[in-house]
Amino acid sequence: MDLSQLRQQIDTIDRQIVDLYEERMDVSRQVAEYKIETGKKVFDKQREQEKIAGVKALTHNDFNSHGVEELFEQIMSMSRKLQYQLLAAHGSEGRLPF
């Protein structure tokens, strides 16, 4: 493969990543609605620690493990941010113990 083909392959993967990110944020919106209805906290430290451990276990080397950890910490941070925004917009911010 030449450089152009490799870059095209990366571009395709990047589009897939964006699509999956948007899909994940859509599910995060649904999670926020559930939390609004049930009064659950946005931040669940145990769940996030379990999630990080789980995705790191899917990697094949230390470099990728560290990268996946950083990636998912950022993704979960953005998910929390979205959930907080939705909770605030819904007027639930003062009623939920988060």
Segment roles from a protein language model:
Residues 1-98:
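Domain-level signature for soluble enzymes in the chorismate/prephenate branch of the shikimate pathway
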